Design a protein with these regions (language model features):
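Rossmann-fold cofactor-recognition segment
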Residues: 49-65
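Conserved glycine-rich cofactor-binding loop
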Residues: 12-15
Length: 274
Protein backbone atom coordinates (compact mmCIF):
# COMPACT_ATOMS: atom_id res chain seq x y z
CA UNK A 1 0.00 0.00 0.00
CA UNK A 2 1.55 3.31 -1.11
CA UNK A 3 1.27 6.58 0.82
CA UNK A 4 -2.17 7.68 -0.30
CA UNK A 5 -2.12 11.41 0.42
CA UNK A 6 -1.15 14.04 -2.10
CA UNK A 7 -1.55 17.37 -0.29
CA UNK A 8 0.00 17.33 3.16
CA UNK A 9 0.06 20.00 5.87
CA UNK A 10 3.20 19.47 7.96
CA UNK A 11 2.98 21.23 11.33
CA UNK A 12 6.54 21.81 12.55
CA UNK A 13 8.49 21.76 9.29
CA UNK A 14 11.54 23.94 9.92
CA UNK A 15 13.86 21.26 11.31
CA UNK A 16 14.23 17.70 12.55
CA UNK A 17 11.56 15.07 12.10
CA UNK A 18 9.02 17.37 10.43
CA UNK A 19 11.40 18.64 7.78
CA UNK A 20 12.78 15.17 7.09
CA UNK A 21 9.31 13.65 6.73
CA UNK A 22 8.19 16.51 4.49
CA UNK A 23 11.13 15.97 2.18
CA UNK A 24 10.47 12.23 2.02
CA UNK A 25 6.82 12.87 1.15
CA UNK A 26 7.86 15.30 -1.59
CA UNK A 27 10.21 12.64 -2.94
CA UNK A 28 7.23 10.30 -3.13
CA UNK A 29 5.18 12.83 -5.07
CA UNK A 30 3.16 14.65 -2.42
CA UNK A 31 2.78 18.43 -2.26
CA UNK A 32 3.73 19.48 1.27
CA UNK A 33 2.80 22.74 2.97
CA UNK A 34 5.36 23.37 5.69
CA UNK A 35 4.25 25.25 8.81
CA UNK A 36 6.54 26.85 11.37
CA UNK A 37 7.65 30.06 13.03
CA UNK A 38 11.04 30.59 11.35
CA UNK A 39 10.46 32.31 8.04
CA UNK A 40 14.02 32.00 6.77
CA UNK A 41 13.88 28.23 7.13
CA UNK A 42 10.49 28.01 5.46
CA UNK A 43 11.76 30.11 2.58
CA UNK A 44 14.78 27.82 2.22
CA UNK A 45 12.49 24.77 2.24
CA UNK A 46 10.36 26.10 -0.64
CA UNK A 47 13.42 27.30 -2.57
CA UNK A 48 15.00 23.85 -2.31
CA UNK A 49 11.99 21.91 -3.54
CA UNK A 50 10.24 24.43 -5.77
CA UNK A 51 6.79 25.96 -5.54
CA UNK A 52 5.30 23.16 -7.61
CA UNK A 53 6.12 20.65 -4.85
CA UNK A 54 6.26 22.72 -1.66
CA UNK A 55 4.66 25.71 0.02
CA UNK A 56 5.01 27.34 3.41
CA UNK A 57 2.92 29.10 6.02
CA UNK A 58 4.57 31.03 8.83
CA UNK A 59 2.40 30.47 11.89
CA UNK A 60 2.80 29.94 15.62
CA UNK A 61 0.42 27.16 16.69
CA UNK A 62 0.55 28.31 20.32
CA UNK A 63 -1.49 31.36 19.26
CA UNK A 64 -4.68 29.47 19.96
CA UNK A 65 -6.99 32.40 19.28
CA UNK A 66 -5.70 32.65 15.70
CA UNK A 67 -5.93 28.98 14.74
CA UNK A 68 -9.49 29.11 13.41
CA UNK A 69 -8.85 31.93 10.94
CA UNK A 70 -5.50 30.46 9.93
CA UNK A 71 -7.04 27.03 9.32
CA UNK A 72 -9.81 28.55 7.21
CA UNK A 73 -7.19 30.32 5.10
CA UNK A 74 -5.20 27.11 4.64
CA UNK A 75 -8.30 25.23 3.50
CA UNK A 76 -9.25 27.97 1.04
CA UNK A 77 -5.73 28.13 -0.35
CA UNK A 78 -5.24 24.36 -0.54
CA UNK A 79 -8.67 22.77 -1.07
CA UNK A 80 -7.06 19.44 -2.03
CA UNK A 81 -5.60 19.08 1.48
CA UNK A 82 -6.02 15.45 2.50
CA UNK A 83 -3.46 14.87 5.27
CA UNK A 84 -2.45 16.81 8.38
CA UNK A 85 0.73 15.88 10.26
CA UNK A 86 0.90 17.15 13.85
CA UNK A 87 4.61 17.08 14.53
CA UNK A 88 5.86 20.21 16.27
CA UNK A 89 7.05 19.86 19.84
CA UNK A 90 9.36 21.20 22.53
CA UNK A 91 11.03 19.45 25.45
CA UNK A 92 12.13 20.94 28.76
CA UNK A 93 13.62 19.42 31.89
CA UNK A 94 11.40 19.56 34.98
CA UNK A 95 12.56 18.62 38.48
CA UNK A 96 9.86 18.33 41.14
CA UNK A 97 12.56 17.79 43.77
CA UNK A 98 13.28 21.51 43.32
CA UNK A 99 9.82 23.08 43.06
CA UNK A 100 11.17 26.60 43.47
CA UNK A 101 12.92 26.21 40.13
CA UNK A 102 9.80 25.17 38.22
CA UNK A 103 8.91 27.83 35.65
CA UNK A 104 5.14 27.51 35.24
CA UNK A 105 4.91 29.62 32.06
CA UNK A 106 7.45 27.29 30.42
CA UNK A 107 5.48 24.27 31.61
CA UNK A 108 2.31 25.72 30.10
CA UNK A 109 4.12 26.54 26.86
CA UNK A 110 5.20 22.92 26.59
CA UNK A 111 1.65 21.69 27.18
CA UNK A 112 0.23 24.13 24.63
CA UNK A 113 2.82 23.32 21.97
CA UNK A 114 2.76 19.55 22.38
CA UNK A 115 -0.93 18.94 23.05
CA UNK A 116 -3.46 21.74 23.50
CA UNK A 117 -2.72 23.37 20.15
CA UNK A 118 -3.35 20.03 18.45
CA UNK A 119 -6.89 19.91 19.81
CA UNK A 120 -7.58 23.30 18.23
CA UNK A 121 -5.93 22.32 14.96
CA UNK A 122 -7.95 19.10 14.76
CA UNK A 123 -11.20 20.92 15.57
CA UNK A 124 -10.74 23.40 12.75
CA UNK A 125 -9.14 21.15 10.09
CA UNK A 126 -11.07 17.90 10.60
CA UNK A 127 -14.36 19.17 9.08
CA UNK A 128 -12.54 19.70 5.79
CA UNK A 129 -11.14 16.16 5.90
CA UNK A 130 -14.58 14.76 6.74
CA UNK A 131 -16.07 16.61 3.77
CA UNK A 132 -13.68 14.80 1.43
CA UNK A 133 -15.62 11.53 1.81
CA UNK A 134 -15.29 9.02 0.32
CA UNK A 135 -11.76 10.05 -0.67
CA UNK A 136 -9.15 8.95 1.90
CA UNK A 137 -7.79 11.46 4.38
CA UNK A 138 -5.58 11.27 7.44
CA UNK A 139 -4.48 12.93 10.65
CA UNK A 140 -0.95 11.86 11.59
CA UNK A 141 0.32 12.51 15.11
CA UNK A 142 3.96 12.28 16.12
CA UNK A 143 4.16 11.24 19.75
CA UNK A 144 7.16 9.58 21.44
CA UNK A 145 8.38 6.35 22.94
CA UNK A 146 8.30 8.35 26.18
CA UNK A 147 4.50 8.18 25.94
CA UNK A 148 4.87 4.48 26.75
CA UNK A 149 7.66 4.61 29.34
CA UNK A 150 8.51 8.08 30.72
CA UNK A 151 11.90 9.26 31.94
CA UNK A 152 12.16 11.41 35.08
CA UNK A 153 14.16 14.28 33.53
CA UNK A 154 11.40 15.67 31.31
CA UNK A 155 8.25 14.67 33.18
CA UNK A 156 5.94 17.22 31.58
CA UNK A 157 7.09 16.39 28.06
CA UNK A 158 6.43 12.69 28.70
CA UNK A 159 2.97 13.53 30.04
CA UNK A 160 2.07 15.57 26.94
CA UNK A 161 3.14 12.73 24.67
CA UNK A 162 1.19 10.19 26.74
CA UNK A 163 -1.86 12.44 26.35
CA UNK A 164 -1.34 12.56 22.59
CA UNK A 165 -0.98 8.77 22.43
CA UNK A 166 -4.24 8.33 24.35
CA UNK A 167 -5.97 10.91 22.17
CA UNK A 168 -4.99 9.03 19.02
CA UNK A 169 -6.60 5.83 20.31
CA UNK A 170 -9.90 7.49 21.19
CA UNK A 171 -10.08 9.67 18.10
CA UNK A 172 -9.34 6.69 15.88
CA UNK A 173 -12.16 4.71 17.47
CA UNK A 174 -14.63 7.59 17.20
CA UNK A 175 -13.93 8.25 13.52
CA UNK A 176 -13.91 4.55 12.61
CA UNK A 177 -17.40 4.17 14.07
CA UNK A 178 -18.85 7.29 12.44
CA UNK A 179 -20.21 6.82 8.93
CA UNK A 180 -19.28 10.35 7.85
CA UNK A 181 -15.73 10.06 9.22
CA UNK A 182 -14.56 6.50 8.67
CA UNK A 183 -12.50 7.50 5.62
CA UNK A 184 -10.30 9.66 7.89
CA UNK A 185 -7.48 7.54 9.28
CA UNK A 186 -5.71 8.45 12.52
CA UNK A 187 -2.06 7.47 12.28
CA UNK A 188 0.46 7.71 15.11
CA UNK A 189 4.22 7.72 14.60
CA UNK A 190 6.03 6.81 17.83
CA UNK A 191 9.70 7.86 17.60
CA UNK A 192 12.59 6.99 19.87
CA UNK A 193 15.16 9.63 20.75
CA UNK A 194 16.29 11.10 17.43
CA UNK A 195 19.32 13.29 16.77
CA UNK A 196 17.58 16.65 16.27
CA UNK A 197 17.69 20.13 17.76
CA UNK A 198 14.99 19.08 20.26
CA UNK A 199 17.87 18.20 22.58
CA UNK A 200 20.31 20.85 21.35
CA UNK A 201 18.00 23.66 22.50
CA UNK A 202 17.99 22.51 26.15
CA UNK A 203 20.42 24.43 28.35
CA UNK A 204 20.97 21.65 30.87
CA UNK A 205 21.82 19.10 28.20
CA UNK A 206 24.15 21.53 26.44
CA UNK A 207 25.92 22.22 29.73
CA UNK A 208 26.61 18.50 30.05
CA UNK A 209 27.63 18.18 26.41
CA UNK A 210 24.87 15.60 26.08
CA UNK A 211 22.80 16.66 23.08
CA UNK A 212 23.76 14.28 20.28
CA UNK A 213 22.13 10.99 21.10
CA UNK A 214 19.50 8.74 19.63
CA UNK A 215 18.65 7.43 16.18
CA UNK A 216 19.95 9.36 13.18
CA UNK A 217 17.32 11.34 11.32
CA UNK A 218 18.00 9.36 8.15
CA UNK A 219 17.43 6.00 9.84
CA UNK A 220 14.32 7.34 11.54
CA UNK A 221 12.73 8.54 8.30
CA UNK A 222 13.49 5.28 6.51
CA UNK A 223 11.78 3.27 9.26
CA UNK A 224 8.83 5.63 9.71
CA UNK A 225 8.25 5.89 5.98
CA UNK A 226 8.07 2.12 5.66
CA UNK A 227 5.18 2.14 8.13
CA UNK A 228 3.41 4.98 6.34
CA UNK A 229 3.79 3.23 3.00
CA UNK A 230 2.37 0.00 4.45
CA UNK A 231 -0.67 1.87 5.73
CA UNK A 232 0.00 1.16 9.40
CA UNK A 233 -1.97 3.24 11.87
CA UNK A 234 0.58 2.80 14.66
CA UNK A 235 4.22 3.14 13.70
CA UNK A 236 6.70 2.53 16.52
CA UNK A 237 10.16 3.33 15.17
CA UNK A 238 13.53 1.75 15.89
CA UNK A 239 14.08 0.75 19.52
CA UNK A 240 10.51 1.71 20.43
CA UNK A 241 9.22 -1.36 18.58
CA UNK A 242 10.25 -3.82 21.31
CA UNK A 243 8.79 -1.62 24.04
CA UNK A 244 5.58 -1.17 22.07
CA UNK A 245 5.12 -4.91 21.56
CA UNK A 246 5.87 -5.66 25.21
CA UNK A 247 3.47 -3.08 26.64
CA UNK A 248 0.66 -2.35 24.23
CA UNK A 249 -0.84 -5.75 23.35
CA UNK A 250 -2.73 -6.15 26.64
CA UNK A 251 -3.82 -2.51 26.64
CA UNK A 252 -5.00 -2.85 23.04
CA UNK A 253 -7.15 -5.86 23.92
CA UNK A 254 -8.68 -4.02 26.87
CA UNK A 255 -9.35 -0.94 24.77
CA UNK A 256 -10.93 -2.89 21.94
CA UNK A 257 -13.28 -4.43 24.49
CA UNK A 258 -14.25 -1.00 25.80
CA UNK A 259 -14.82 0.27 22.26
CA UNK A 260 -17.05 -2.69 21.41
CA UNK A 261 -19.17 -2.12 24.50
CA UNK A 262 -19.45 1.64 24.18
CA UNK A 263 -19.50 2.21 20.43
CA UNK A 264 -20.86 -1.10 19.22
CA UNK A 265 -19.31 -3.71 17.00
CA UNK A 266 -17.16 -2.37 14.21
CA UNK A 267 -13.54 -1.86 13.31
CA UNK A 268 -11.26 -2.23 16.33
CA UNK A 269 -9.29 0.86 17.21
CA UNK A 270 -6.16 -0.71 15.75
CA UNK A 271 -7.71 -1.63 12.41
CA UNK A 272 -5.06 -1.46 9.73
CA UNK A 273 -2.08 -1.62 12.08
CA UNK A 274 0.64 -4.18 11.61
Amino acid sequence: MAFAYKTVLMIGCTAGIGLALAERMIEDGSFVIGVGRRKERLDAYVAKHGSDRAAASQFDITDLDSIRDWAEDIIKTYPSLDCVVLNSGIQRSLNFAKPAEIDLPLVQQEITTNYTSYISLIKHLLPHLQARAPEPAAIVTVSSGLALVPIPRCANYCATKAALHSLAWSMRAQLAHDEASKHVRVVEIIPPAVQTELHELQDDLRAKGDTRFGMTIGDFVEDAWAGLARGDVEIPVGPVKARFEALEKARREQFDGVVSRMLGEGQPYSSGSK
